[in-house]
């Protein structure tokens, strides 16, 4: 009886391990700071991310309103001290991001992130 329980326990553990390996991968998280150290700049916590689901956690630490646009999606306009989360799916290559407030991208509030 003990041997049978052990065999069943090992089989169940193996199935659980296989199921977790097949589970959908979790999204990569990137912290984005707008407005600091310079008002018209973004600072990203990562310069490279794996292809797939990416969650951008955007915080405006400046005093001017900003948003964050990437892969055809964007956050709402964020006043100083406000935050938003943006979930996108990125393909391999370079993904461009920018602030859509008129004049901000031209002043340097844009960039790319490498997707591998």
Which functions belong to the PLM regions below?
Residues 1-6:
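Bacterial Sec-dependent N-terminal signal peptides
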Residues 9-20:
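Bacterial N-terminal signal peptides
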Residues 25-34, 79-116:
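Extracellular/periplasmic metallocenter environments
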Residues 26-51:
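N-terminal edge beta-strand
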Residues 39-45, 72-73, 81-85:
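N-terminal post-signal-peptidase region of extra-cytosolic proteins
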Residues 45-64, 84-96:
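Beta-strand cores of secreted/periplasmic/IMS beta-sandwich domains, seen most often
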Residues 65-72:
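Short, surface-exposed beta-strand/strand-loop-strand elements in extracellular ectodomains
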Residues 72-74, 115-116:
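Short edge-strand/loop segments of extracellular domains
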């Amino acid at each position: 009886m003990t041997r049978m329980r052990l065999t069943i326990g090992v089989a169940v553990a193996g199935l659980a391990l296989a199921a977790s390996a097949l589970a959908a991968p979790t999204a990569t998280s990137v912290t984005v700071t707008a407005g600091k150290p310079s008002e018209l700049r973004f600072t990203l916590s990562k310069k490279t991310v794996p292809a797939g689901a990416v969650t951008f956690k955007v915080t405006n630490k400046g005093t001017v309103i900003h948003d964050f646009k990437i892969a055809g999606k964007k956050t709402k306009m964020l006043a100083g001290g406000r935050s938003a989360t943006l979930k996108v799916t990125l393909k391999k290559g370079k993904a461009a991001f920018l602030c859509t407030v008129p004049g901000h991208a031209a002043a340097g509030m844009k960039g790319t992130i490498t997707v591998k």
